[in-house]
Design a protein with these regions (language model features):
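Hydrophobic, well-ordered secondary-structure elements that form the walls
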Residues: 283, 300, 326, 340, ...
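Gram-negative/organellar outer-membrane beta-barrel architecture
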Residues: 26-33, 39-177, 272-275, 336-339, ...
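Outer-membrane beta-barrel "beta-signal"
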Residues: 182-185, 323-333, 349-360
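Sec/Tat signal peptide C-region and signal peptidase I cleavage site
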Residues: 20-24
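Bacterial N-terminal signal peptides
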Residues: 7-19
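N-terminal secretory signal peptides that target proteins for export/translocation
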Residues: 1-5
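Short loop/turn motifs that connect adjacent beta-strands in outer-membrane beta-barrel proteins
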Residues: 25-30, 57-64, 90-95, 140-142, ...
Length: 360
């Protein structure tokens, strides 16, 4: 099993004691605070807390706004703290999202490409801050324009003095500043932003990192994310997603497309595989079990490559992902939920994920 966080204690507490802390009430805003406990080989014991607040609008035309605080610390004196807001205006005409984070947290590195061997595993610790702000403006109906800016400033410390990341041959091995300007368009007619049951989501976003934007590196990226939701009745839904990422220019190693996260290609350690380009697709079946408790089953696959044409090559390696999960709805009149997913990837890799709201 790869070194993915395993917050078992949190998963148990979420599924056994959440209802009492999120009891239904008539106020427009709901808040909950939960403990965090986990472990990983590179961190030892992890502990902390998260606070989540959702404001439910009084009209159906306005989508709910949220805010989250998260803090964790580990037995090896590593830490992560972030604040995140997602604010919708009346009628969902404007949307503003912001994220601010400081971390000193280890991540694995195996090299580049889909053939990076397990034996090449080493760890590096980025220390610093990252932040982003995205503005979304409705043009007409479900069509939005999207613009934003992202910035990070990290110092990277490799775990091994003789490892690959100790060599300046790998771009970005010492860290540095990355500033990116983002522009895009979005079609979004989903019925709910937390756990959609019908509708579609299609977003194309281009980003450019360059010196005028505060970046030490010059590269560009195009991300296309498409989702569709098919209602099957009685609280059941089939969710579909396809994602493509293409990167050009001189991108540092930590800005490449990565396999392994809590949203798609679950079951791999974060960054287990990385390259310039990525294509992935997944399907997820979601259903209600009992009252606020639900379950999900998902399967997907993806590829990474140094250029787009290689993604379609017959000899390219396909990375599988599949698993099951539980869901607990937080509030009686909202679909916001806590999800606990167990996923498996290729070659015996697996991971347990605890997160707010659906993966997509």
């Amino acid at each position: 099993m790869q070194s993915i966080m395993r917050p078992f204690a949190l998963a148990v507490s979420l599924l056994t004691g959440l209802s009492a802390s999120a009891a239904a009430q008539e106020s427009a805003a709901r808040t909950f605070v939960l403990p965090y406990l986990g472990s990983a080989p590179e961190t030892g014991i992890q502990y902390g807390a998260t606070a989540f607040r959702v404001r439910l609008p009084s009209d159906s035309a306005t989508r709910p706004s949220t805010a989250q605080l998260f803090a964790s610390y580990t037995g090896k004196r590593q830490a992560r703290v972030f604040a995140e807001v997602d604010r919708w205006s009346a009628g969902s005409v404007w949307r503003l999202t912001g994220h601010l984070e400081w971390k000193r947290f280890p991540l694995p590195f195996h090299g580049f490409g889909d053939a990076a061997p397990d034996a090449a595993e080493e760890f590096y610790t980025p220390t610093g801050v990252l932040g982003s702000m995205i503005v979304q403006r409705r043009v007409r109906g479900p069509l939005y324009l999207v613009g934003g800016y992202g910035y990070q400033d990290f110092r990277i410390t490799p775990s091994a003095a003789d490892g690959a990341l100790a060599s300046d041959a790998i771009l970005g091995n010492r860290g540095g500043r990355v500033g990116q300007l983002q522009l895009g368009a979005l079609w979004d007619d989903r019925d709910d932003v937390f756990a959609s049951r019908r509708g579609s989501f299609l977003q194309a976003t281009g980003s450019n990192a360059a010196r005028p934007f505060g970046s030490e590196y010059a590269f560009r990226r195009l991300v296309v994310d498409g989702r569709h939701f098919v209602p099957l009745g009685a609280g059941r839904v089939l969710a579909l997603q396809a994602v493509t990422e293409m990167t050009g220019g001189e991108a540092p190693f930590d800005q490449l497309s990565l396999v392994g996260n809590s949203n798609y290609l679950r079951g791999y350690a974060h960054g287990r595989y990385r390259d310039l380009d990525l294509a992935a697709a997944q399907a997820e079946y979601r259903a209600r079990l009992w009252r606020r408790l639900g379950w999900a089953a998902f399967a997907g696959a993806g590829r990474i490559a140094p250029r787009p044409a290689r993604l379609l090559a017959s000899g390219a390696r396909t990375l599988p992902s599949y698993g099951i999960g539980l869901r607990h709805t937080l509030f009686a009149n909202s679909r916001s939920n806590i999800r606990v997913d167990y996923a498996r990837g290729g070659r015996g890799q697996s991971g347990l994920y605890v997160a707010l709201n659906e993966a997509f």
